[in-house]
Design a protein with these regions (language model features):
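Short S/T/G/P-rich N-terminal loop/turn motif that feeds into the first structured element of a domain
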Residues: 27-262
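Bacterial N-terminal signal peptides
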Residues: 11-23
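Bacterial N-terminal signal peptides that target proteins for export
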Residues: 1-14
Length: 262
């Protein structure tokens, strides 16, 4: 936003990923959206307020978001806060669904509107630390539903083992085909993080905490049917999860009061 289940064989399933999939309410009435229709790149800032200045930070962020909206910025920014984890002090501010050329247009607006200066005057004094990332959605392996009713996002961040991307993608192809063949009703999105280590992120939107319940049918049951056998399902899941060195999971809550959404 600155101008610029068990710990056994089934942790080798998508315990780290799809078993974290919330048992969301049916989404058949929602329209499935291909992220490539508009763009699949997100701009993502992570900001930490200075110690003891959370209230001041939020007031300044609200002011700066209003300034950017009034100044006609082409990007729309959404703000999120973690609600689980060891660090609950940071804010994630992101703008989604862009093509790369959109960043040139936003940079041009930023220079003309002097957005850097406005940031430094309004929000900068209350920021202790900032990190910046891009995120590229893998639309071919995602099953996304747009809805204005999402409040929470469950995010699993997985660090890929060196040289494991090929095997991981083969497994993901099998899983995605089963998801589509079985008409799995739950939305999710895979995205590669640009900046830092080589991480694949799984984002699960939720309209309430109730939607964090396990899906029904379970992921394994769905894959067993879609891939033809329990052995094939377990093999694909093991191949997928075995491609990662570590994983982190957290839940974020939307903060529309600190965003520039329409």
């Amino acid at each position: 936003m600155i101008a610029r289940c068990r710990h056994s064989a089934f942790i080798a399933t998508l315990t780290l990923v799809f078993l974290l999939l919330p048992g969301m309410a049916a989404v058949a009435a929602d329209k499935m959206v291909a992220k490539t229709a508009t763009g699949n790149i997100a701009d993502r800032w992570v900001l930490w307020p200075k110690a003891g200045q959370t209230a001041e930070f939020e007031a300044a962020l609200k002011q700066h978001a209003a300034w950017r909206k009034k100044a006609g910025e082409p990007f729309t920014w959404l703000t999120y806060q973690p609600v689980v984890g060891s660090d609950l002090t940071y804010y994630v501010i992101r703008s989604d669904d862009h093509q790369w050329k959109d960043f040139d247009a936003d940079d041009a607006w930023s220079k003309k509107a002097k957005a850097d200066e406005a940031y430094e005057q309004q929000l900068g004094p209350h920021v202790a630390r900032a990190e910046h990332y891009f995120e590229e959605t893998d639309a071919a392996h995602s099953h996304w539903t747009d809805s204005k009713d999402y409040i929470y996002s469950g995010v699993t961040s997985m660090r890929l083992k060196p040289g494991a991307r090929g095997d991981m993608m083969i497994a993901l192809d099998k899983i995605q085909k089963a998801v589509m063949d079985e008409k799995w009703p739950y939305p999710y999105r895979f995205a590669w993080l640009m900046g830092g280590d080589n991480r694949l992120r799984l984002i699960i939107p939720m309209k309430s905490y109730a939607e964090m319940a396990d899906p029904n049918p379970s992921v394994r049951a769905m894959l067993t049917k879609g891939l033809g056998s329990a052995e094939a399902a377990d093999s694909a899941l093991k191949q997928f999860s075995g491609s990662f060195e570590d994983e982190q999971y957290t839940v974020y809550a939307s903060r529309p009061d600190l965003s520039t959404q329409p």
